[in-house]
Regions:
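Structural alpha-beta junctions
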Residues: 35-43, 59-62, 100-103, 126-131
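Conserved SAM/SAH cofactor-binding pocket of Class I
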Residues: 3-59, 188-261
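A short SAM/SAH-binding and catalytic strip from SAM-dependent methyltransferases
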Residues: 78-89
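Conserved SAM/SAH-binding loop
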Residues: 65-70, 261
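SAM-dependent Rossmann-like transferase core, predominantly class I methyltransferases
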Residues: 139-205
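A short acidic, Gly/Pro-enriched loop at the edge of an enzyme's catalytic core
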Residues: 68-78
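N-terminal auxiliary segments of SAM/dcSAM-dependent transferases
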Residues: 89-167
Length: 261
């Protein structure tokens, strides 16, 4: 299913010129990715490993990381971003844009009313010291273009780059960061699974190896390690999750590997 907001911003991107960057998350699907192949001087930045792999397969320059625009090492004429679900991610991208734009470069921001696009437009106008040029689409969809005039105070990104202790279980601290679903919570369903796993360990003993698919910040892996599991392989599609999980592995000395998948 195509995303109208992403279609809208990609159409605007195709009408622009110069060095262009599309910041992409889970909204970007393979069919739209194929249409981007024809755009010259286009780069992608994504925090989703599947998007990165698809871009590679289609020979589109792409960087996979935790939404760090500076890693592109380029000054862009256009940075285009279809707003994400998480406010901290949106603010983080907006805050970085001025440092990676050319002197006359522009930021394109697109989203729906129920995603807070009206508020984001107002905040960016204050931050960049400019008035947005706004185009409207169907179903209260808006596309805004900004040019940096005078920088104000950056937006609150919840200290996006920082890993934070969000709690402790079984005497082990749990670290996480913004940029992933449920980053500052301990999922109740996962807690139930850990309790069931503990009962299993009491009966059958701890497993020598364990695979944690969609590991998030690593809650299940850390708890499995606390309950005696041996080598643990943890994977996730999200760059923020991978960074968080790796940190938890390192501080607790967990034997195993955390990888993107």
């Amino acid at each position: 299913m195509t995303d109208p907001a992403l279609d809208f911003i990609c159409n605007a991107l195709s009408e622009s010129s110069g060095q262009r960057l599309l910041v992409a998350d889970e909204h970007l699907d393979s069919s739209l990715l194929l249409s981007l192949k024809t755009l010259p001087d286009l780069s992608l930045l994504t925090n989703r490993y599947d998007v990165y792999r698809s871009a590679q397969d289609n020979n589109i320059p792409c960087i996979f990381n935790d939404m760090d625009i500076s890693a592109c090492n380029t000054r862009f004429d256009v940075i285009a971003y279809r707003v994400s679900k998480e406010k901290a991610v949106v603010h983080h991208i907006i805050n970085q844009a001025p440092a990676s734009l050319n002197a006359k470069g522009s930021l394109l921001l697109c989203g729906f009313k129920n995603e807070g696009i009206k508020t984001y437009i107002s905040k960016v106008e204050q931050y960049l010291g400019c008035k947005a040029l706004v185009s409207k689409g169907e179903r209260q969809l808006k596309l805004a273009q900004f040019r940096v005039t005078e920088l104000g105070e950056p937006l609150d990104d919840r200290e996006y780059r920082q890993l934070t202790c969000i709690g402790e279980q079984r005497n082990l601290a749990l670290f996480s960061k913004p940029g992933q679903y449920g980053w500052n919570k301990i999922d109740k369903g996962s807690e139930l699974l850990v309790n069931a796993f503990a009962d299993h360990v009491n009966i059958a003993g701890a497993p020598a190896t364990l695979l944690d698919l969609g590991c998030g910040y690593g809650y299940l892996s850390v708890m499995a390690w606390a309950l005696g599991a041996g080598q643990i392989m943890a994977t996730d599609n999200n760059a923020a999750a991978i960074a968080s999980c790796r940190h938890n592995f390192e501080i607790h000395g967990i034997q195993g590997e955390v990888s993107a998948d």
